Amino acid sequence: MNTTIPVRLSERLNTPISTAELERRWKAVRAAMERDKIDVLLMQNNNDHMGGYVRFFTDVPATNGYPITVVFPRDDLMTVVMHGGFGMAQSLPPGGNGILRGVKKVLGTPSFACAPYTFSYDPELAAQALAPYAGGTIGLVSTYQMSFAMVDNLKRGAFANTRFVEATDLVDTIKAIKSAEEMQRIRDSAHM
């Protein structure tokens, strides 16, 4: 799935990863998903200090405690759930919006980890994006950074007959082997 359509990247991205590098990552992960018979990956981060799976897939970090959830299908573009107003649903053009690339839809909700009455907001939107995969296999990436509410809500709802597997190692083995671009970023960081 080639999503390379020239798009001007926003100045809001701090030293953005090239679209070609993102596509290399997505292709490698999708091949591993095919091998392991995983239909879709689900990941969630709420900070950029540890893990960074959201950033690895989207080039946008989760920050300041606001959760970002990524639904990464084996055969389609991503859906991202992030902080926003109730009912926020934005379809992105091919190539992205200057910030998000490889994403077909952004769903928003005003969820806060410190407000327990919002615990179901993110899972409800993730469930919308995961609906085509009910009864299939969902790979959970970085379960130690995913809220209990996310997985609990999914497993008790429409996904009760869905197979959930730990998929962090699937992604980590790909993340561990650095491309030339990633190696240059590491050198640039070390140089500072």
Each model region followed by its residue ranges:
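A composition/biophysics-driven feature that prefers long, compositionally simple stretches
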Residues: M1-M192
